[in-house]
């Protein structure tokens, strides 16, 4: 009998409240400013000024509300107008935001704000490429827990903006029995049996498999999700057929060595999900620049 499925109730479709984010932003500003922004302070740039942010290449925007917040922490009167919505695709030379306020605050906050938005937009951009590559298939692209410590919430937020589904936000969202768990427990069967005896409440259980023998064993345990890890597409297609014939309610995830080049081949095997850490761990930053507007 299939167990009750409990999955993450709050995918990162929106940012956490400012009461949570503000300390992060203040810490990052303090890291950059140190004992003072001598370049800006030395020039006495405390009058009102204007600036705009421009995309220097095509991509997907993520994080502009946090950029606005960074500038407003430095200058509460700062006016920040977002011209590109979160998750919006933009082309090179697009003005994505304009701002007006204390010129010194604009220059002091520039690097921290740009770094944050460029990094998150890079994740959203590469994620969108992965999602679009399998748009003709029912397969969904999902992210992983391979994130920068302390930045998981923001990186998974950018991943969602790119179109991915969030996998576990943390270890408490669901149970994933990986190769080291299996090695420690003795077998897939022993691991799943022990988990079902000891879990405090019903959680979805996913088992990682690397060959057809392990797939058969995982099927017999009636887990909710079976991961096909680092399998060739021929073996993967056979595994999908075995699982569907045995129990069509079991969901199937493909993972390991996933690239843009092999995404469609993997999706064509019939898996439900394809997971990859690449958009978060390997995406280049989206190139943006701030331009001071002279009156």
UniProtKB/Swiss-Prot annotation:
GO annotation terms (biological process): NAD biosynthetic process; quinolinate catabolic process
Protein purpose: Involved in the catabolism of quinolinic acid (QA).
EC top class named in words: transferase
Source lineage: Bacteria, Bacillati, Cyanobacteriota, Cyanophyceae, Synechococcales
The name this protein goes by in its record: Probable nicotinate-nucleotide pyrophosphorylase [carboxylating]
Catalysed conversion reaction: nicotinate beta-D-ribonucleotide + CO2 + diphosphate = quinolinate + 5-phospho-alpha-D-ribose 1-diphosphate + 2 H(+)
CDD domains in UniProt: QPRTase
Molecular function in Gene Ontology: nicotinate-nucleotide diphosphorylase (carboxylating) activity
Functional pathway: Cofactor biosynthesis; NAD(+) biosynthesis; nicotinate D-ribonucleotide from quinolinate: step 1/1
Gene3D superfamilies linked to this entry: Aldolase class I (3.20.20.70), Quinolinate phosphoribosyl transferase, N-terminal domain (3.90.1170.20)
Protein species of origin: Synechocystis sp. (strain ATCC 27184 / PCC 6803 / Kazusa)
């Amino acid at each position: 009998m299939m167990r009750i499925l409990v999955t993450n109730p709050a995918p990162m479709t929106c940012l956490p409240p400012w009461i949570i984010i503000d300390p992060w932003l203040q810490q990052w500003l303090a890291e950059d400013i140190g004992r003072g922004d001598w370049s800006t302070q030395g020039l006495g740039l405390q009058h009102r000024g204007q600036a705009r942010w421009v995309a220097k290449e095509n991509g997907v925007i993520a994080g502009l509300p946090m950029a606005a917040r960074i500038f407003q922490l430095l200058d509460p009167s700062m006016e920040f107008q977002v011209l590109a919505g979160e998750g919006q695709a933009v082309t090179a030379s697009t003005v994505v935001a304009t701002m007006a306020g204390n010129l010194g605050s604009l220059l002091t906050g520039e690097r921290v704000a740009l770094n944050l938005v460029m990094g998150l937009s890079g994740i959203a951009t590469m994620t969108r490429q992965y999602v679009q590559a399998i748009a003709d298939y029912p397969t969904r692209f999902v992210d992983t827990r391979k994130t920068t410590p302390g930045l998981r919430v923001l990186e998974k937020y950018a991943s969602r903006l790119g179109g991915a589904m969030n996998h576990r936000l943390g270890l408490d969202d669901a149970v994933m029995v990986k190769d080291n768990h299996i090695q420690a427990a003795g077998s897939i069967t022993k691991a799943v049996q022990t988990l079902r005896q000891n879990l405090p409440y019903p959680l979805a259980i996913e088992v990682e498999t690397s060959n057809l023998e392990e797939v058969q064993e995982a099927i017999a345990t009636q887990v909710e999700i079976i991961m096909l890890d680092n399998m060739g597409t021929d073996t993967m297609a056979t595994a999908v057929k075995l699982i569907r014939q045995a129990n069509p309610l079991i969901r199937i995830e493909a993972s390991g060595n996933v690239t843009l080049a092999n995404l469609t081949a993997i999706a064509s095997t019939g898996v439900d999900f394809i997971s990859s850490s690449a958009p978060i761990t390997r995406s280049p930053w989206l190139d943006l620049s701030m331009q001071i507007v002279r009156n």
